[in-house]
């Protein structure tokens, strides 16, 4: 044991131990010199930092966040931009900043509901704080990061618009219901116009309008044409005589005004919201083709009904075109207005304009210019000057234009009913003259900001016209509402039910939609009626010996069943033996009245309306007491006819069955088909066959509105812009 303790150590291990000790001593000596130098340097830097800044204060940062930022849905701010604001705050307050990660934790203490999103194109995306905006009172205020502006994203965090956050899709409005339509109880109906039929028509028309609105929201504009054709050309025969009534025509006008206003609000909620080019193009195409679709769908219907439908649809199309052009101008003007350098130059050029001279020239154009007009021009001039001086966003200019039209047109016209058109014309004349003179003055003086003023002038003009056109549409709807309720003129309204008269055949291939005329007509004596005192409304029925066929340019003359000519004024059987009171007045109803005798039996089945809307009603309508010819419940056959019943593209005429046997054919040439060839499925608007294929298996085309399966959306049959993914539209418009 003692021998073990006195045992000599191994020489190799001893040498390695000595070498290791020497190395460690050298390292300690070197590190001591280095540490002394580092300590001196760190002390100097720490002293400098203590002299330059204060330690970080979280409460001060939270207070700064509360004063400069607020919660705002739909607004995004790049994280880098917000951190730069924070660094600027620390520099101005001599505060030690924390790193970006720690700053993010402080932000969430102030705004717990804040979320982050990665926005931008592939490879260029950046993280953004979503749901926070810069307050207008903040020194960091920028319209692109505020509630008033859209979210803007770029590499610097300021200048490029983020299309992911501003792209608009009408599908976001799915489930939108139309406002209430007129109630038959509130109408002043003539005694001869059955209330049950009017109520039925309003219910049918509301269903039709709701289907059109839902189709527009889904962006299936091609189906609008099919719905128009199916509704008007599939109208049940017993409803046809009331379509020419002025009361029903006014109801259609009021309902169309409601529908068009809803569609306009769905397609473009505001003119300031950026729209993708694909959506703009489709809207303009829809506005262009709507009139042609109505011409085809309303062919052979009463003239007064056609006129009101055409008038309102053309106003609606004009407003859609105005909205699209105005939206483009607003986006271009936004860049100009939000530039501080440009607005400063515009303000300088604006104040160099000779206001007195321009005001005098403007007053020369007015019929009765007064001193109040001069004061109004001066006031508007000063208000615009203030907007430029404050570098207001484009939303402030739009609000100013709204207020101007309200006090110069709406309030003035409200003092005198029916004066809106004249007041609007007078204001528009003054506005146009003043704006033109301002642009002229800037041109003569070579104003540096002339181009910017010209762009703003175009945008202002379009917006004022848009407001005035909207006022005219609303005024027209109010007129129709007053006429519908009997609040218009006190004169007795005489209604005419005149059969469409045939015209001579024309070789022109261009479709002719105006009613044909004939010199001969045959009066139809009505059957006996329990009504003792018939009203002028819905009072008579006359037919002509010449009937117009369901073609655009060719007409046929149909002799009576007995073979006697029309000149002998032989009585013709009334359509469906419907009771019509006697009267000396006539009324225009659609040709071809004897459609059931020749295979035209198509109409609607509105049985599912109760499942679609909460209005109490039955799925089938009982027999109407005023109509003795209808003995049982009404059930309308489905519209989709067989080729034998309704040969759309058949070269032979649909009237051929009635021209067989002893009646000679008057025209040996084939009849032009009723419906023109429609574009192929590769175009934006598909043919009605697509609708038939989709709904043809159902006996009721007005099924409850449900979301379609993903497989039902054929990408080639819808306009480019929607890509239907998992039942929802991820729009290509955002690209």
Swiss-Prot record:
Q: Does the keyword Transcription apply?
A: yes
Question: Hey, what tissues is this thing expressed in?
Answer: Isoform 1: Expressed in brain and gliomas (at protein level). Isoform 2: Testis-specific (at protein level). Isoform 3: Testis-specific (at protein level). Isoform 3: Expressed at a higher level in adult testes and ejaculated spermatozoa than in fetal testes. Isoform 4: Testis-specific.
PROSITE patterns assigned to the protein according to its UniProt record, in alphabetical order:
RFX_DBD
Q: Which Gene3D superfamilies match?
A: Winged helix-like DNA-binding domain superfamily/Winged helix DNA-binding domain (1.10.10.10)
**Any single biological process term in GO:** cilium assembly
- Coarsely, its chief localization is nucleus
Q: Where is the stretch described as Disordered?
A: 27-59, 504-540
Keyword Nucleotide-binding belongs to the record: no
The family this protein is said to belong to: Belongs to the RFX family.
Q: What is this protein called?
A: Transcription factor RFX4
What gene codes for this chain? Answer: RFX4
């Amino acid at each position: 044991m003692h021998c073990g303790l006195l045992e000599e150590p191994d020489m190799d291990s001893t040498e390695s131990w000595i070498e290791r000790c020497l190395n460690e001593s050298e390292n300690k000596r070197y590190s001591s010199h280095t540490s002394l130098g580092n300590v001196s340097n760190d002390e100097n830097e720490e002293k400098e930092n203590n002299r330059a800044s204060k330690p970080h204060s979280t409460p001060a940062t939270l207070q700064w966040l509360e004063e400069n930022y607020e919660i705002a849905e739909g607004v995004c701010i790049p994280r880098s931009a917000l951190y730069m604001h924070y660094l600027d705050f620390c520099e101005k307050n001599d505060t030690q900043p924390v790193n970006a990660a720690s700053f993010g934790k402080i932000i969430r203490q102030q705004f717990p509901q804040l979320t982050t999103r990665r926005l931008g194109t592939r490879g260029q995306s950046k993280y953004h704080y979503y749901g926070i905006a810069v307050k207008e009172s903040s020194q960091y205020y920028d319209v692109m990061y505020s509630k008033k502006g859209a979210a803007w994203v770029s590499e610097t965090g300021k200048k490029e618009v983020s299309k992911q956050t501003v792209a608009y899709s009408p599908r976001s409005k799915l489930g939108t219901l139309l406002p209430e339509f007129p109630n038959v109880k509130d109408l002043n109906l003539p005694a001869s116009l059955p209330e049950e039929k009017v109520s039925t028509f309003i219910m049918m028309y509301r269903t039709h309008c709701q289907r059109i609105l839902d189709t527009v929201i889904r962006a299936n504009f091609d189906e609008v044409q099919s719905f128009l054709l199916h509704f008007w050309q599939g109208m049940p025969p017993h409803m046809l005589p009331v379509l020419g009534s002025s009361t029903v025509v006014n109801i259609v006008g009021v309902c169309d005004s409601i529908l068009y206003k809803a569609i306009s609000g769905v397609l473009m909620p505001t003119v300031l919201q950026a729209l993708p080019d694909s959506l703009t193009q489709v809207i303009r195409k829809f506005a262009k083709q709507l009139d042609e679709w109505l011409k085809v769908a309303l062919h052979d219907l009463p003239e007064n009904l056609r006129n009101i439908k055409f008038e309102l649809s053309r106003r609606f199309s004009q407003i859609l075109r105005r909205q699209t052009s105005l939206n483009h101008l607003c986006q271009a003007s936004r860049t100009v207005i939000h530039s501080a350098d440009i607005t400063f130059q515009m303000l300088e050029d604006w104040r160099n304009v000779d206001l007195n001279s321009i005001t005098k020239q403007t007053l020369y154009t007015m019929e009765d210019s007064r001193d109040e007009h001069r004061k109004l021009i001066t006031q508007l001039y000063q208000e615009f000057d203030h907007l430029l001086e404050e570098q207001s966003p484009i939303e402030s200019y739009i609000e100013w234009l709204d207020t101007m039209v309200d006090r110069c047109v709406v309030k003035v016209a409200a003092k005198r009913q029916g004066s809106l058109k004249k007041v609007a014309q007078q204001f528009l004349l003054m506005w146009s003259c003043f704006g033109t003179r301002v642009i002229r003055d800037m041109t003569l003086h070579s104003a540096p900001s002339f181009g910017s003023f010209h762009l703003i002038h175009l945008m202002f003009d379009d917006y004022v016209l848009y407001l005035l056109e909207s006022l005219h549409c609303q005024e027209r709807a109010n007129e129709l509402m007053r006429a519908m309720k009997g609040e218009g003129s006190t004169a007795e309204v005489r209604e005419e039910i005149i059969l469409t008269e045939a015209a001579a055949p024309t070789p022109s291939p261009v479709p002719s939609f105006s009613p044909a005329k004939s010199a001969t007509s045959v009066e139809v004596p009505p059957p006996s009626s329990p009504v003792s005192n018939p009203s002028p409304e819905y009072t008579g029925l006359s037919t002509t010996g010449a009937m117009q066929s369901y073609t655009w340019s060719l007409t046929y003359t149909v002799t009576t069943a007995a073979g006697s000519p029309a000149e002998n004024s032989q009585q013709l059987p009334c359509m469906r033996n419907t009771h019509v009171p006697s009267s000396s007045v006539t009324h225009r109803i659609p040709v071809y009245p004897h459609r059931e005798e020749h295979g035209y039996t198509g109409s609607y089945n509105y049985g599912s309306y109760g499942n679609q809307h909460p209005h109490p009603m039955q799925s089938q309508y009982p027999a109407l007491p005023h109509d003795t010819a209808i003995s049982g419940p009404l059930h309308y056959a489905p519209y989709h006819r067989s080729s034998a019943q309704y040969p759309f593209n058949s070269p032979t005429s649909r009237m051929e069955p009635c021209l067989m046997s002893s009646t000679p054919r008057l025209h040996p040439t084939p009849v032009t088909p009723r419906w023109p060839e429609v574009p192929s499925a590769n175009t934006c608007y598909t043919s009605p066959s697509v609708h038939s294929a989709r709904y043809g298996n159902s006996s009721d085309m007005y099924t409850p509105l449900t979301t379609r399966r993903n497989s039902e959306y054929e990408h080639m049959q819808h306009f480019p812009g929607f890509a239907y993914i998992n039942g929802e539209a991820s729009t290509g418009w955002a690209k």
